[in-house]
Amino acid sequence: MAHKKAGGSSRNGRDSNGQRRGVKRYGGEIVRAGNILVRQVGTRIHPGENVGMGRDYTLFATIDGKVAYERKGRDKKKVSVYPV
Protein backbone atom coordinates (compact mmCIF):
# COMPACT_ATOMS: atom_id res chain seq x y z
CA MET A 1 0.00 0.00 0.00
CA ALA A 2 1.51 3.26 -1.13
CA HIS A 3 1.36 5.82 1.65
CA LYS A 4 2.80 9.31 1.98
CA LYS A 5 3.58 10.59 5.47
CA ALA A 6 2.49 14.11 6.41
CA GLY A 7 5.01 16.71 5.25
CA GLY A 8 6.69 18.95 7.79
CA SER A 9 5.54 22.55 8.04
CA SER A 10 7.80 25.34 6.84
CA ARG A 11 8.83 27.96 9.37
CA ASN A 12 9.19 30.71 6.75
CA GLY A 13 6.52 32.45 4.71
CA ARG A 14 5.85 35.64 6.69
CA ASP A 15 6.70 39.26 5.95
CA SER A 16 5.58 42.51 7.52
CA ASN A 17 4.39 45.52 5.58
CA GLY A 18 6.82 48.37 4.91
CA GLN A 19 6.73 51.42 7.20
CA ARG A 20 6.60 53.98 4.32
CA ARG A 21 9.50 55.98 5.65
CA GLY A 22 11.73 58.31 3.69
CA VAL A 23 11.73 61.74 2.06
CA LYS A 24 8.20 62.89 1.14
CA ARG A 25 9.05 66.34 -0.29
CA TYR A 26 12.28 66.97 -2.20
CA GLY A 27 14.47 70.08 -2.49
CA GLY A 28 12.93 72.85 -4.58
CA GLU A 29 9.34 71.72 -3.99
CA ILE A 30 6.76 74.25 -2.77
CA VAL A 31 5.03 73.12 0.45
CA ARG A 32 2.23 74.31 2.68
CA ALA A 33 2.54 74.66 6.45
CA GLY A 34 1.98 71.24 8.04
CA ASN A 35 3.20 69.23 5.05
CA ILE A 36 5.33 66.23 6.03
CA LEU A 37 8.85 66.49 4.60
CA VAL A 38 10.59 63.36 5.97
CA ARG A 39 9.49 60.27 7.90
CA GLN A 40 12.46 58.71 9.69
CA VAL A 41 13.69 56.73 12.69
CA GLY A 42 15.96 58.97 14.73
CA THR A 43 17.42 62.22 13.42
CA ARG A 44 19.03 61.11 10.17
CA ILE A 45 18.02 64.55 8.92
CA HIS A 46 17.75 67.42 11.41
CA PRO A 47 15.13 70.17 11.39
CA GLY A 48 16.37 73.52 10.06
CA GLU A 49 14.65 76.88 9.48
CA ASN A 50 10.84 76.76 9.68
CA VAL A 51 10.75 72.97 10.17
CA GLY A 52 9.26 71.21 13.19
CA MET A 53 9.85 67.69 14.50
CA GLY A 54 7.17 65.30 15.78
CA ARG A 55 7.49 62.71 18.55
CA ASP A 56 8.42 60.03 16.02
CA TYR A 57 11.10 62.27 14.41
CA THR A 58 8.83 63.21 11.50
CA LEU A 59 9.90 66.54 10.00
CA PHE A 60 7.17 68.94 8.85
CA ALA A 61 6.95 72.46 7.44
CA THR A 62 5.82 75.22 9.83
CA ILE A 63 5.33 77.82 7.06
CA ASP A 64 4.41 77.86 3.37
CA GLY A 65 7.57 77.95 1.26
CA LYS A 66 10.26 76.14 -0.70
CA VAL A 67 12.10 73.05 0.62
CA ALA A 68 15.91 73.09 0.82
CA TYR A 69 18.17 70.27 2.02
CA GLU A 70 21.51 71.48 3.43
CA ARG A 71 24.60 70.13 5.10
CA LYS A 72 25.05 70.88 8.78
CA GLY A 73 28.78 70.55 9.38
CA ARG A 74 30.63 67.63 7.84
CA ASP A 75 28.35 64.69 8.53
CA LYS A 76 24.89 66.01 9.37
CA LYS A 77 22.03 67.00 7.08
CA LYS A 78 19.18 69.40 7.74
CA VAL A 79 16.05 70.41 5.90
CA SER A 80 14.69 73.96 5.90
CA VAL A 81 11.70 75.73 4.38
CA TYR A 82 12.20 79.27 3.10
CA PRO A 83 9.43 81.71 2.16
CA VAL A 84 9.01 82.13 -1.60
Curated annotation (Swiss-Prot):
Q: List the lineage, top down.
A: Bacteria, Pseudomonadati, Thermodesulfobacteriota, Desulfobacteria, Desulfobacterales
Q: Which UniProt keywords apply?
A: Ribonucleoprotein, Ribosomal protein
Against Gene3D superfamilies, the record matches this protein to: 2.40.50.100
The record, for HAMAP family, names: Ribosomal_bL27
Fetch the Pfam families from UniProt: Ribosomal_L27
Record's keyword annotation contains RNA-binding: no
Q: Which GO terms describe its biological process?
A: translation
| Gene Ontology cellular-component annotations | cytosolic large ribosomal subunit
Recorded protein name is Large ribosomal subunit protein bL27
Q: Using the UniProt annotation, give all residue ranges assigned to the region (Disordered).
A: 1-25
Q: Under the GO molecular function aspect, what terms does this record hold?
A: structural constituent of ribosome
Tell me which family the UniProt entry assigns to this protein. Answer: Belongs to the bacterial ribosomal protein bL27 family.
Signal peptide bounds: none
What InterPro entries does this protein map onto? Ribosomal_bL27 (IPR001684)
